[in-house]
Amino acid sequence: MRELFGIVPTLDLHGLGVREAVSETERFLREAQAQHLPSVRIVYGKGHGSPGGRGVLREVIPRWLETDGQHLVARFERRPDASGADGALMVWPKKLSD
């Protein structure tokens, strides 16, 4: 699915530890809700800089969205880059009730 106007607000979590990444993700999604943004992008990377070459955030962030962050998110899906590698999520924040 393409975004109609091309620019999607993006949070880049590269270089952050788990606690800081989760905290930044929550802050970003609350701000997205407050601004009534239809969708946002969260980049966690592929893990090339992580020990073992497998990123921790690629597992932690989606799991957090499904559990503790579910009250902020209507849905999300992984978004591969041009090479087909998974390093980002497209997230649709829940709308705030009036």
Q: What spans do the regions from the language model cover?
A:
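Long, charged, low-complexity intrinsically disordered regions
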Residues: 1-98
